Structures are given as C-alpha cells and as structure tokens.
C-alpha cells in the first residue's frame, strides 16, 4: 500500500479542502492521512459539506507525533519570525518513521496536481523537480554536514511533494544516528547553518530527503510546471495544457483561500473551485 500524509497547519485548512477536490489526479494512493493541529471535528463537520467522504481520511494530530518524538520541539528557534516553519519540517521527517508503509507521499496542501501524477513506479520514486533551480545555500550546507554527501543534482526538489521508501528511511536514520551519535531529529537540526546577522536556520526537508535517495537508488523525475497564484484573480490565466500543478504563492493570507472556523466554511469556495475546474 502507498500512503499519503498531507500536513495541514491552521491557516491551510481552506487550501486542503480545495486540494482534495483534485485528488483524482493523484494515481496509486491507497490511504490519505491528514496530519494537523486542527481539531478533528472541523474536518468531520466540513469535508462532507464539500463533497468529500470523511471516512476516506485518517487523522493524526501534531501532538501525537510530538508525543512520540519530543525532539520535534528542538526545531523551534527563539525569535524565529517564521513561527513553526521548521517544526513543520520536523513533523514531516518524523512521519517517515511513524507511519508503517513501504511507500509514502508527503504533501503540502497549498500545491496540488492538475494533471495525472503517479509518485511511485513500483518501488522507484517519481519526484517532481524544478530544473536548474537553486535555493538558499543553507539547504545544501545541511545536506553535506548532516549526511556527509554533496548535492546530487542541479535540479530542485522543493515541489511540495515528496515520495519516500521506508527502506531508504531506515538507512538514512541509521546513518544520521551513527554519524552524529544522537536522535535523528537532533542530528539534522544540530548540523544546520545559521544565517549571518539573523541567526536563522534555512533548511529544506525536500532537498535533504531527495538528495539522500539519489545516493541509494535510481529515481524518476517529472518536471513540475507550476502555475503560481499570487492573488486569486490569477486563476483566470490557468491552463492545464501548460501546467501540471496549482501552487498557492500568495504572500498575504488575505489574498489566498481562507477558512472560517466558526462556520466551518471556505470563503467563496464555489467561485474559486469553479474558476480552477473550468480551466482543466
């Protein structure tokens, strides 16, 4: 079986409900877990409202993972203006240990496929990549310091999708703990570069994990052609012949898909959904 774990922070509830409408483009997924800090009642009271079967999903609260891996909290950095940005990455990495599936797909809900995508070809992971893209130097410094390997490709794996094999997780965890003599989560965060002047840690779980996999096996790649929405009015320019993923790239939350918790309602859901669906 192949599992999918979708990580939904509070401000991404509306994005998740929209992304789930397009799950038919994801091929080969047997079970979906929602990993979240949002109470389960909000999902069960909302999914059916938007045509989704609540029983199709399994729910894991963030606290369940934190209880199992308290080292997650070591990723919280005092004074970090990004809030729980690093913690979310620790949760994803911990989930690879927590879930008992041979193949798993990690996904952020602000990005979803709008063309068919199969994340595994048998036991060969199929990664979305951004060709010839480089991000913060800290991402690649952490790979070298933590794993003892160089960046394996000029392509970028920061796609919001991460297929991973359990057997690769086992070897990676063993490497980290043997190399650094500490829990795997501490081994990673303790070997990250701090930005001069700000003391911030820049880290990408997607780059870290995928570059490791490339040292273990051959992979398949699919170029991610991202339709990046910076305000909802941009949707009218969507063309599924040109793009294969919808990406919420709004810098201001008020320009993005919003969710009202008091009424369990996605603001302007029908308008936004119809605008996207009509272009596919």
Summary of predicted features, one role per range:
Residues 33-34, 59, 103-108, 112-114, ...:
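A structural signal for short, well-ordered beta-strand segments and their strand-loop junctions
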Residues 1-20:
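N-proximal low-complexity "stem/linker" segments adjacent to membrane-targeting elements
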Residues 117-199:
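Conserved catalytic core of nucleotide-sugar-dependent glycosyltransferases
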Residues 183-280:
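A glycosyltransferase accessory/donor-loop signature
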Residues 91-132:
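GT-A fold catalytic core of metal-dependent nucleotide-sugar glycosyltransferases
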Residues 20-29:
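Short, acidic, metal-binding catalytic loop of nucleotide-sugar glycosyltransferases
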Residues 29-40, 60-64:
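Short beta-strand/loop segment that forms part of the nucleotide-sugar
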Residues 42-97:
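Active-site-proximal specificity loops/subdomain of glycosyltransferases
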């Amino acid at each position: 079986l192949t599992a999918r774990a979708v990580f939904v922070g509070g401000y991404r509830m509306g994005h998740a409900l929209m992304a789930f409408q397009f799950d038919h483009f994801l091929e080969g997924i047997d079970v979906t877990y929602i990993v979240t800090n949002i109470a389960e009642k909000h999902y069960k009271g909302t999914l059916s409202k938007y045509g989704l079967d609540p029983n199709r999903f399994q729910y894991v609260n963030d606290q369940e993972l934190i209880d199992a891996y308290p080292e997650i909290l070591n990723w919280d950095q005092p004074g970090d203006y990004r809030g729980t940005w690093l913690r979310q990455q620790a949760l994803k990495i911990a989930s690879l240990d927590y879930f008992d599936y041979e193949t798993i797909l990690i996904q952020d809900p602000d990005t979803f496929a709008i063309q068919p995508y199969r994340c595994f070809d048998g036991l060969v992971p199929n990664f979305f990549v951004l060709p010839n893209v480089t991000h913060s130097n800290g991402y690649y410094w952490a790979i070298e310091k933590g794993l003892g390997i160089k960046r394996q490709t000029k392509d970028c794996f920061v796609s919001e999708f991460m297929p991973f094999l359990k057997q690769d997780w086992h070897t990676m965890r063993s490497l980290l703990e043997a190399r650094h003599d500490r829990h795997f989560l501490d081994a990673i965060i303790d070997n990250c570069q701090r930005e001069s002047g700000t003391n911030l840690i820049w880290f990408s779980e997607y780059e870290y994990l995928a570059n490791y996999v490339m040292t273990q096996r051959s992979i398949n790649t699919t170029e991610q052609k991202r339709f990046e929405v910076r305000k909802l009015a941009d949707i009218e320019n969507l063309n599924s012949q040109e793009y294969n993923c919808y990406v919420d790239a709004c810098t201001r939350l008020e320009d993005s898909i919003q969710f009202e918790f008091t009424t369990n309602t996605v603001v302007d859901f029908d308008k936004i959904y119809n605008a996207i669906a009509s272009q596919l």
